[in-house]
Amino acid sequence: MFQFVTPVGTQNGLKATCAKISPDGQFLAITQGLNILIYDINRRTVSQTLVTSHARPFSELCWSPDGQCIATASDDFSVEIIHLSYGLLHTFIGHTAPVISLTFNRKGNLLFTSSMDESIKIWDTLNGSLMKTISAHSEAVVSVDVPMNDSSILSSGSYDGLIRIFDAETGHCLKTLTYDKDWKRENGVVPISQVKFSENARYLLVKSLDGVVKIWDCIGGCVVRTFQVQPLEKGVLHHSCGMDFLNPEDGSTPLVISGYENGDIYCWNSDTKSLLQLLDGSLYHHSSPVMSIHCFGNIMCSLALNGDCCLWRWV
């Protein structure tokens, strides 16, 4: 079960908007205003502040695989890569709307970004050039992900209700996943809010704006697990709440972690679908929607809309 470790405080009264654990599990990158705070998880203190050149707030951030750089996506349509020691390395300009999601490939030489402009762009992080633009969807592309151990494929999720798998090198669409008979509702499609590959890249964790979390078999193109809390009266949530896989360090079955609008966090066994734990938001420091969930090893970071950021440990 999860044990609460500590709340993560920010500076100057500004609330956190994004939070991600570093690849070595030692640090937490937190966006605050137009800056990034590097929080030392073991010492429980802010060890560094990175200043960005963004003109508008962040949408997302991610660490490079070597833990030396952080990429940021902003509402100002731009993307920046900042080195922890040397500062700003690149500013990528090319999207024509806010950038929503981004991820590095395993080697760190490519950065994939997605935007409200309905496209995915592939950037060369070494020379700072745009390599390819993928016209991926008919609505905003709100999530992209690359498998941890396989950089040959890329997944995307969009407000058009579709999930796509691409060849990361050519940009060719390999597969389109839909919710079949459930894909279209009376009031339209159910927008996708987040996608996340499993460690072996065989499965894709997908969350939609109706709060439902599903595991897709990427090869078979079918849903193999569905996780759902109490049905929603209006069918669609007001916020895009976070979710992630947690892969326990003891090698046991991965967990599916999902946050919700009332501040609750649900933890399921990904194989049996059994609910292992419910973290009550009213008791565990979250009194507003859980916008972000990020896991590394046995550590989970949760971030709420009101800026409350918390660290947890699976024991």
Swiss-Prot record:
**Which protein are we looking at?**
COMPASS component SWD3
CDD domains, per database record: WD40
Listed GO molecular functions?
histone binding
Q: Which PROSITE patterns match?
A: WD_REPEATS_1, WD_REPEATS_2, WD_REPEATS_REGION
What does the subunit comment say?
Answer: Component of the Set1C/COMPASS complex which consists of SET1(2), BRE2(2), SPP1(2), SDC1(1), SHG1(1), SWD1(1), SWD2(1), and SWD3(1).
Gene3D superfamilies this protein is in?
YVTN repeat-like/Quinoprotein amine dehydrogenase
GO BP annotations of the record are:
regulation of meiotic DNA double-strand break formation; subtelomeric heterochromatin formation; telomere maintenance
Cite a GO CC annotation: chromosome, telomeric region
Q: Which residues form a coiled coil?
A: none
- Effect seen on changing E186K: Results in nearly 50% loss of H3K4me3
Q: Which domain of life is it from?
A: Eukaryota
Give the gene name: SWD3
What keyword terms does UniProt attach to this protein?
Chromosome, Nucleus, Repeat, Telomere, WD repeat
Write down a Pfam family by its short name: WD40
